[in-house]
C-alpha cells in the first residue's frame, strides 16, 4: 500500500522548510547592559502544525513581549533620587519613563519571525527615556525642590544653574504635584490661559499637562514661603533672566523631577535687584 504522504512529498518538504526556517531565527533585544535573546528553541514552541499548515501563535508572541514590557518599562514606577541636598529620596508619580507599545511590537516581532530574518530589534515605544537601567532619567535633568522653592539644572552630571521660584498656591489647593516628568515642548512668547486668567510669558516650558516653568515678570521676589498664600495656579514661576537661561539649556524630553524634602524650608525670599 502506498503511504498518503511520502518523504519527498512537496507539501511535506514545504512544511519541514517552514519549521526549519522558524528554528534558525535568533532575535536580540538590548536594554542597556541587559540582553534578551529569542531563539528557535523558544519560537518552535509557539508553532501550531495542522496537517501541512504551520502557523505562529500570536498570543504566545504577545505574552513574550508582555514579559519584556513588565521587566523593562519604567513609566509610573517609583524612583530613587539623590538630591542636591545630599539626601536620597523616593520620588513617586509622574509620567516619565520607558513605555513599550507591546501590541505593536508583538505584531512587528511576529512579522520578522515569519520572514525567517535574524537580527537585533529595538522595541516600538509610546515613549522613551534617557537611559536603560537606574536611573532612567540619566544625568541631564531639572531638579525642583518644592519645599525649598529652589531648582537646579544638571547637564551631563554637572550643575549648570540654579534658581529660586514660586510654585502653586497651597492655601488655594494649587500645589504643584510631585513626580518625574519631561519637558513636553518649549515655546517663546506664549499666552497661558486658565479659567480666570490669561497671562503672556516670554519663556514657556511645560512638563505636566498645563503645568510648566516660565518667567513671571509681575513678581519682584521668589523663594521662601511665598507659595503658601501667594503662589501660582501650579506653575513654577521664575525670575525672567533665570527662565531665559534655563530655556536655552533644556529641550523637549529633558527630565523634570519634583519633590518635597523636609528640613530644607527657607523663610527668606530672594528680592530681584531694582
Language-model features, listed with the residues they occupy:
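Active-site scaffold segments
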Residues: 204-258
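Surface-exposed, secretory/extracytoplasmic low-complexity segments enriched in Ser/Thr/Asn/Gly/Pro
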Residues: 1-198, 203, 250-252, 257-274
Amino acid at each position: 500500500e502506498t503511504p498518503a504522504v511520502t518523504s519527498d512529498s512537496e507539501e511535506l518538504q514545504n512544511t519541514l522548510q517552514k519549521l526549519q526556517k522558524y528554528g534558525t531565527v535568533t532575535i536580540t533585544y538590548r536594554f542597556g547592559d541587559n540582553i534578551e535573546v529569542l531563539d528557535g528553541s523558544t519560537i518552535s514552541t509557539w508553532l501550531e502544525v495542522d496537517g501541512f499548515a504551520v502557523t505562529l501563535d500570536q498570543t504566545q508572541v504577545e505574552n513574550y513581549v508582555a514579559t519584556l514590557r513588565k521587566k523593562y518599562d519604567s513609566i509610573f514606577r517609583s524612583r530613587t533620587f539623590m538630591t542636591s541636598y545630599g539626601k536620597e529620596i523616593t520620588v513617586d508619580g509622574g509620567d516619565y519613563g520607558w513605555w513599550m507599545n507591546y501590541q505593536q511590537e508583538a505584531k512587528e516581532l511576529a512579522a520578522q519571525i515569519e520572514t525567517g530574518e535574524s537580527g537585533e530589534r529595538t522595541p516600538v515605544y509610546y515613549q522613551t527615556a534617557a537611559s536603560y537601567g537606574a536611573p532612567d532619567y540619566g544625568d541631564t535633568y531639572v531638579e525642583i525642590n518644592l519645599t525649598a522653592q529652589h531648582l537646579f539644572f544638571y547637564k551631563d552630571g554637572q550643575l549648570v544653574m540654579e534658581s529660586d521660584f514660586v510654585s502653586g498656591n497651597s492655601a488655594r489647593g494649587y500645589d504643584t504635584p510631585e513626580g518625574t516628568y519631561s519637558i513636553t515642548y518649549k515655546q517663546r512668547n506664549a499666552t497661558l490661559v486658565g479659567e480666570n486668567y490669561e497671562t503672556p510669558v516670554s519663556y514657556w516650558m511645560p512638563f505636566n499637562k498645563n503645568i510648566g516653568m516660565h518667567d513671571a515678570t509681575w513678581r519682584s521676589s521668589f523663594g521662601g514661603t511665598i507659595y503658601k498664600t501667594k503662589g501660582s495656579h501650579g506653575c513654577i514661576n521664575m525670575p525672567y533672566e533665570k527662565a531665559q537661561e534655563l530655556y536655552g539649556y533644556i529641550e523637549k524630553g529633558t527630565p523634570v523631577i519634583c519633590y518635597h524634602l523636609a528640613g530644607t524650608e527657607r523663610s527668606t525670599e530672594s528680592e530681584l535687584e531694582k
